[in-house]
Amino acid sequence: MSKDDVIEVEGTVVEPLPNAMFRVELDNGHKVLAHVSGKIRMNFIRILPGDRVTVELSPYDLTRGRIIYRHK
């Protein structure tokens, strides 16, 4: 799967889960399970409930995603 196949959507972090996982509510109302991307983890960017984030979803499984950006 190439980078062109991913779906980028924005959402709000609802709750933190163990192992750097988060429940994110997307703008369209769906809730997905998202983990933190490597660059966010390496730069020690903290993600808290209520933060606006950009989530990258795979077209094969729309219930899981990767948090790639935390909006300021």
Curated annotation (Swiss-Prot):
Family per similarity comment: Belongs to the IF-1 family.
Name of protein: Translation initiation factor IF-1
Residues in S1-like domain copies: 1-72
Cytoplasm is among the record's keywords: yes
Subunit-level organization: Component of the 30S ribosomal translation pre-initiation complex which assembles on the 30S ribosome in the order IF-2 and IF-3, IF-1 and N-formylmethionyl-tRNA(fMet); mRNA recruitment can occur at any time during PIC assembly.
Claim: Protein biosynthesis is one of the keywords in the record: yes
Record InterPro entries: NA-bd_OB-fold (IPR012340), RNA-binding_domain_S1_IF1 (IPR006196), S1_domain (IPR003029), TIF_IF1 (IPR004368)
Species lineage: Bacteria, Bacillati, Bacillota, Clostridia, Thermoanaerobacterales
Listed CDD domains: S1_IF1 (cd04451)
GO cellular component, one term: cytosol
Organism this protein belongs to: Carboxydothermus hydrogenoformans (strain ATCC BAA-161 / DSM 6008 / Z-2901)
Keyword field: Cytoplasm, Initiation factor, Protein biosynthesis, RNA-binding, rRNA-binding
